[in-house]
Design a protein with these regions (language model features):
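Cyclic nucleotide-binding regulatory domains
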Residues: 6, 32-94
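Cyclic nucleotide-binding regulatory module and flanking cytosolic helices
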Residues: 1-30, 74-75, 79-82
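Polybasic "coupling" helices that flank or enter modular domains
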Residues: 110-182
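Cyclic-nucleotide recognition modules
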Residues: 67-128
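Short aromatic/basic micro-patch
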Residues: 9, 25, 68, 99, ...
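Phosphate-/nucleic-acid-contacting segments
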Residues: 154-231
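Alpha-helix/helix-capping structural signal
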Residues: 49, 103-104, 173, 212
Length: 231
């Protein structure tokens, strides 16, 4: 299980040590919470299958989507140093996560350099993704959505899945919330991309037809796609 939950160059002995602290959580159905704000911060999680949405609530109780979690991705590390989670993680579809006790993981990472390096890499990538998201919030709407689709494509590729044909687990409203766009704007942009021959859509299934065109739309060179890949 640890090979999926926390990819790292570990020896067989180290993998076995990690496996001993990994446990599979109960299956989550659409709408079930993996954790909520103010839940005790005792574990970190890695999604094994399905998809999750992370979000915060503002002062008015309105939802602000902060990211989408795909299989093989970790969540909860950003709350390290806190005693409670500050946000929510909810299943967008039937999902399964594995959990690791935080104290045991910290102890193990102190004894396994490769594991410690991987955890630091995940934290660094998350911070970079947040900065990139803030930077892109100032861009035009068509750039934001193009970058979002390319980022999803890269994340699917990194997990050995098709980067050119995938199903969106989130609604267009949730995409709009994340990108700070109205659902009408998101729908209009999808129509524009389809008419331009950039993508093809059947329900929530998306097929990327012209990656170079999407990169131009997003203001990216093709080799820059990786910078859009973090949630």
């Amino acid at each position: 299980m640890s090979r999926l939950c926390l990819p790292a160059s570990l020896s067989e002995e180290e993998v076995e040590a990690l496996d001993r602290i990994v446990r599979r959580s109960r299956p989550l159905h659409k709408g079930d919470y993996l954790f909520r704000a103010d839940d005790p911060m005792r574990q970190v999680f890695v999604l094994r299958s399905g998809a999750l949405k992370s979000y915060l609530l503002d002062a008015n109780g309105d939802e602000q989507v902060t990211g989408f979690v795909l299989p093989g991705e970790m969540l909860g590390l950003d709350a390290i140093g806190e005693t409670r989670f500050c946000g929510y993680a909810v299943a967008l579809e039937t999902s399964l996560a594995c959990a690791m006790d935080l104290e045991q993981l910290e102890d193990l990472s102190g004894r396994i350099p490769g594991l410690r390096h991987q955890l630091l890499h995940i934290l660094s990538r998350g911070i970079h993704g947040e900065h990139e998201h803030i930077r892109r919030s100032r861009e035009r709407a068509e750039q934001r959505l193009a970058s979002f689709l390319l980022g999803l494509s890269m994340r699917y590729r990194q997990r050995g899945l098709s980067p050119d044909r995938f199903t969106l687990p989130m609604t267009r409203g949730e995409i709009g919330n994340y990108l700070d766009l109205t659902v009408e704007t998101v729908s209009r942009l999808f129509t524009r991309y389809i008419q331009a021959g950039l993508i093809e859509c059947h329900g929530r299934e998306v097929r990327l037809l012209d990656r170079s065109g999407l990169c131009r739309m997003g203001g990216l060179e093709e080799h820059q796609e990786a910078s859009t890949s973090r949630r």
